[in-house]
Swiss-Prot record:
Protein name: RanBD1 domain-containing protein C584.03c
Keyword Protein transport: no
Organism: Schizosaccharomyces pombe (strain 972 / ATCC 24843) (Fission yeast)
Domain of life, source organism: Eukaryota
GO cellular component: cytoplasm; nuclear envelope; nucleus
Modified residues (Phosphoserine): S441
Xref: InterPro entries: Ran_GTP-bd-rel
Amino acid sequence: MDELLNVASHAATFATNFALKHSISFAGKLAVQQVSSYIKRASADDQSELESVKTQLLEMIRVVTPAIELIEIMSVGENENFKSTKQLVDSLHADIEQFTKHVLSAAHSEFPPSSEKETLQKNVDTSILREMKTLLLKINDAVPLLNLSITTSGASISSSLPKSTSFSQLLRANSYIYRANVAFTGNEPLQVGPTFFLRTYKIIDNHAKSGYISNDLVMWKEEMPVCIAKMFRMPPQRLKSKDTVLAYALSLKQSFDDDRYHDEDETPVTKTISLNDVRTLFFSLSGKLLRLDDVQTPVLLLKYADDETEYSSNTAPSNWIALEALPLVSIPNESLDESDELAESLSDSEAARLQLLGIKKQESVAKKKSSFPSTIKDQPNLTLLEYLIRLCALESTTQESVLQLPDEQIALYLKDYQGRERPRDPASYNALENRSELSASPGSVSSSRHSGIFATPTFLSPWNIKNIPLVTPEVSTRQTKNVDEEDSALLMASPSVRKSNLLPQEDLISKDSVIKLKENPSVIPHSEPESSSKVINCQAKLNVEKEKKNP
């Protein structure tokens, strides 16, 4: 859905692209680890040279990793400046993976005991050493091209976080991930963070093929009126890749407790989205900006693929899903799991207070379960889910804990790839109303009755946009043109004219105001004629002032 991607990219949304595969840092570290394992069984004559080349390769990978990861993420964001450079990055990535496989096979190969064993081992050592030097040479040749590509594109690697970052939600999400990683055993999926209650939307299939519907119109359909969303860390044995250790998935399950009629044979909709398949995350401050006309609250929009093979083709279709946080809704106890999920729902302040009181967590959970209300208060907001997705996707891509990653790498997954900012508090956002005379925003698809909404510029303060007048682009252009013409005429005028225009106007209310008013009657507004007595008194005062000046 290119039109939806275009709309979401130019609306008041906050978009982040995720890398398609494991990062280059993970591939490089894996290659170095395999080389280290191989060196231990290599011949004594070749160990020193292999160790020296391995050190050079490791340092070079560490240096170029930030630049390569920046190019990978920016190229996913449809940045045309990185299209050609992305091919070079993919080639380096493939060379590193191929080298890792070769070293791995050589490390596990066993030679039969014979007189030729030393000769065979020597040949393998020579082959590994030659491949390491070739890979090091390729990386050295690619460094100037990577530097040139980043410089010309204007992209930069910065460790500073966006001003709109909600640090409380970010730290809370990191705390949930850390506790889940500590408790993870590797046998069963483990929930990360609390349970979210959402409403999901999907795009109507094949709507663009209809001859009665415009191709630029994106039509949404409510999929799950009440959705129970949970983030899980998946065990390695359930993953396709054997090298993957950290993997997360977002589980979406429909709840029939939505005050709607459902058939007896109807089954709830369930969906599991692996974060390895998520390509782009959009955070919109209003669903209207994504053409969800009935949604005025913040919305998360995910673009993902069904699996890795499907997304490998450029023409492969992508799936879209919109997530809206539900207000305070009534969810019966049966919708929740047992005490372990209730324990996860305990806030950090509650856990600290119970620890000071000496109350065990299990006892508190039992009390909480017995008196659990039918209405859930203080539900986790959509921002917390957003940060959970971002941080879990980062761990899944780098195969490292967030606590071990540098600031620059974390900042890449928390920033908008177009450099935009959003208000920290979504409730303070005020979208401009739909006007029929307004045209589509720049870069978006043509306007329609479902998409004629103008997004508030995200660089403006949300408290200063209420009184901004709504003007059409034609009027705005005409006003700007008139101002430019006036400025040009003033610059081309004589110095005396410019000086008179630039000097401040003299105040009419001064000691000589009566004389000026008499000499310039045109500046006096039209009013009722004064009485004859007042005119005589005014004339007498003028005569007295003249006599004082000229005795």
